[in-house]
């Protein structure tokens, strides 16, 4: 296919146009008074949404070159979402501000490579400062505050996540389900999560989120490699009759057996998903036994004289719901408390008897996974559109609170970055010179952009607010919900340090890449053939 090649300033300007379109669409959602965006869907009702990364994923432009700019800035949002689970809009706004300021300097003759070095050095300095100013999370009030801000100022959501963390622990599993009523409820049930995802992406039932969600599945647990599909046929036939889904957790599944499962899944013969068992050697077997206890099934192992080809439905475990993504598997089980408690007591006994600190640590991990359970938040709403929006906000809030537990919290609402701007300027003036200093100044100028956008979305003058905040103590910022200047930590307006850090790093990375772009190679738009002329008497003269 013929290609279109664009050089220098023209290439960078084309990218900039795409970046402008995406940044503007996403930035309207920032802050407590951010607006919603409506996404038109080919099928079903339109989606009303307030989530930066979801909006970014939907935007595709007709112009291939501009679309490349969209894809670049979308990457900043996606990477921030992968690392911290929130802060995608902030990352987009920051990247946009850095690109705009940087392109002005490149157009004026600055060397893009030296600018990028300055941007990287400034980012490294800021990451250290964010770490310095972060405070560890100490109580459930701070957790609730974090969740509230991430969910778009929904206090009920913040409280619910804090309660969930109290019940399952800070490392515990919090899962989301679509509820059957209008209210959002919290329930704690038996369950566990382990760090292995699906073997093949073809098992995903939700292709947008790349997740496999199976309700009330049978669970086949085995510690052997499944090489031949013939071993599975008897049990697959029994399950096909019940019409229920199946999850296979095995040491491994070889190509032939895997291909057969995938084909059956794609043809709709059997709703199945396969996962590799976690751990190695004896630990793997012990974890599979834990899962068997949890799901009220049996581990099919030759040590116990059980063979895969002789497996029956009675040997399989059952669960309420299993959610599998590319990295983790979450099992939500229920109604098996006695057996789980007995198994936990057995693990505690083993911990008392062992002298090895390594074994103790691994047993402790197993105990935490088994005893912690799963907090299930059932999302309730009046309409499906509201349900989807609520679910995305809850997901952001859960991710934000987990990030806060990991790396602590900093003053929110764009305050931290705005206060770091003069600190960065002071350091850069001493430590850098020439075009590297200009690169650091580009970062410094962009640091107030999230705060300015939050203020503008609330109907205030962003530039004035940003200057006022910079002159105040580090903890003081602008509360866009009330229009006052307050102590952000005391007012409960906090952001996880990890979210602020990830957003800044990803924005700087994308800005550096755009500034150092000198040439774009893209597909030429295809010429569409003219439509054939209509037959006589078949004119296009319609009244609508």
Curated annotation (Swiss-Prot):
Keyword field: ATP-binding, Chaperone, Cytoplasm, Isomerase, Nucleotide-binding
Catalytic activity: ATP + H2O + a folded polypeptide = ADP + phosphate + an unfolded polypeptide
Recorded GO CC terms: cytoplasm
A Pfam family this chain is assigned to: Cpn60_TCP1
InterPro entries: Chaperonin_Cpn60_CS, Cpn60/GroEL, Cpn60/GroEL/TCP-1, GroEL-like_apical_dom_sf, GROEL-like_equatorial_sf, TCP-1-like_intermed_sf
GO MF, any single term: isomerase activity
Enzyme category, top tier: isomerase
UniProt-listed Gene3D superfamilies: GroEL, GroEL-like equatorial domain, TCP-1-like chaperonin intermediate domain
Binding-site residues, ATP: 29-32, 86-90, 413, 479-481, 495
Entry's EC annotation: 5.6.1.7
Keyword Cytoplasm: yes
GO biological process: protein refolding
Locations listed in the record: Cytoplasm
Family: Belongs to the chaperonin (HSP60) family.
Family matches, as NCBIfam families: GroEL (TIGR02348), PRK00013.1 (NF000592), PRK12849.1 (NF009487), PRK12850.1 (NF009488), PRK12851.1 (NF009489)
Subunit structure: Forms a cylinder of 14 subunits composed of two heptameric rings stacked back-to-back. Interacts with the co-chaperonin GroES.
PANTHER family with a match to the protein in the record: 60 KDA HEAT SHOCK PROTEIN, MITOCHONDRIAL
Known function: Together with its co-chaperonin GroES, plays an essential role in assisting protein folding. The GroEL-GroES system forms a nano-cage that allows encapsulation of the non-native substrate proteins and provides a physical environment optimized to promote and accelerate protein folding.
Protein name: Chaperonin GroEL 2
């Amino acid at each position: 296919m013929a290609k279109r090649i664009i050089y220098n300033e023209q290439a960078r300007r084309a990218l900039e146009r795409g970046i402008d379109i995406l940044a503007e669409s996403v930035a309207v959602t920032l802050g407590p008074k951010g607006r919603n965006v409506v996404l038109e869907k080919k099928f079903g009702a339109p989606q009303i949404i307030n989530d930066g990364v979801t909006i970014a994923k939907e935007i595709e432009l007709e112009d291939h070159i501009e679309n490349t700019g969209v894809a670049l800035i979308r990457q900043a949002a996606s990477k921030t979402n992968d690392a911290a689970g929130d802060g995608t809009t902030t990352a987009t706004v920051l990247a946009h501000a850095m690109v705009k300021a940087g392109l002005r300097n490149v157009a004026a003759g600055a060397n893009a490579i030296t600018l990028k070095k300055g941007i990287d050095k400034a980012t490294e300095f800021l990451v250290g400062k964010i770490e310095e100013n972060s405070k560890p999370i100490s109580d459930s009030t701070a957790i609730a505050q974090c969740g509230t801000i991430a969910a778009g100022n929904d206090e009920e959501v913040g409280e619910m996540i804090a309660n969930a963390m109290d019940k399952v622990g800070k490392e515990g599993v919090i899962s989301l389900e679509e509820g059957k009523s209008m209210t959002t409820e919290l329930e704690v049930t038996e369950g566990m999560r382990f760090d292995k995802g699906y073997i093949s992406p073809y098992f995903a039932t939700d292709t947008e989120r790349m997740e496999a969600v199976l309700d009330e599945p049978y669970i086949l647990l085995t510690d052997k490699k499944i090489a031949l599909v013939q071993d599975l046929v008897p049990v697959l036939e029994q399950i096909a009759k019940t019409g229920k889904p199946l999850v296979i957790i095995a040491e491994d599944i070889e190509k032939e057996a895997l291909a057969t499962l995938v084909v059956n899944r794609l043809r709709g013969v059997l709703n199945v998903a396969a996962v590799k068992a976690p751990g190695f050697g004896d630990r793997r077997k012990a974890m599979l036994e834990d899962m068997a206890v949890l799901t009220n099934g049996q581990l099919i192992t030759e040590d116990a004289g059980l063979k895969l080809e002789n497996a029956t439905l009675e040997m399989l475990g059952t669960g309420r719901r299993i959610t599998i993504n590319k990295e983790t598997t979450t099992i939500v089980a229920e109604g098996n408390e006695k057996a789980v408690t007995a198994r936990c007591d057995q693990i505690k006994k083993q911990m008392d008897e062992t002298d090895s600190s390594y074994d103790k640590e691994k047993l402790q991990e197993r105990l935490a996974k088994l005893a912690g359970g799963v907090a299930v938040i059932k999302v309730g709403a009046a309409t499906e559109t509201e349900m989807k929006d609520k679910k995305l906000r809850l997901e952001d809030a859960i991710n934000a609170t987990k990030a806060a537990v990991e790396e602590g919290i900093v003053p929110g609402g764009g305050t931290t970055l705005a206060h770091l701007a003069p600190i960065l300027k002071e350091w850069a003036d001493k430590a850098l010179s020439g075009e590297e200093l200009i690169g650091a100044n580009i970062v410094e100028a962009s640091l107030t952009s999230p705060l300015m956008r939050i203020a503008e979305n609330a109907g205030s003058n962003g530039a004035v607010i940003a200057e006022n905040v910079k002159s105040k103590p580090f903890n003081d910022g602008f509360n866009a919900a009330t229009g006052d200047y307050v102590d952000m930590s005391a007012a409960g307006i906090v952001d996880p340090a990890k979210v602020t850090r990830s957003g800044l790093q990803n924005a700087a990375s994308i800005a550096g890449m755009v500034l150092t772009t000198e040439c774009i190679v893209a597909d030429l738009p295809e010429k569409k053939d003219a439509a054939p002329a209509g037959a006589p008497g078949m004119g296009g003269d319609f009244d609508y």
